Amino acid sequence: MSAQEASKPTGWSGHQNFTMDDLAAMQPGLARIMPEIGTRYWKLYYAAKENNWTLAHFQLKEIKELMEFGMVTRPKYEEHLDTFIKDDLGAIEKAIKAQDWNAVDAAFQQGITNANDYHQLNNKGFIVWKLPDYPPPDIDLTPQD
């Protein structure tokens, strides 16, 4: 190990020391984040359809946070992610706050179109997200409040 490497701050994981460069390299890109976003987008849709506005809003908030994280770890996508958050998720949020299922559905469908357009713009046109035609089986969508 060089003197320069030895002087870099490290942190112990319980298994080994990691430098800041090691930690930076481990940060997930959109290939790891987007599947979670897709799952939450799916849950948001069916939660709203069942009038579980609290769960729908929670999923929306989590999607925003994941996209914001993606803007940090993959800044080349920042502009498109930011636009999607402001425009598409903004329209969905407005509809959720109004508890307007028809507006949620319309904004959600537009979001799918726009997301797939972003995939095309970023040379990832082979990724075409679609809404499953059934609700997620791993969560009770019944309103709890």
Where would I find each of the regions flagged by the language model?
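C-terminal-biased regions
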Residues: 2-145
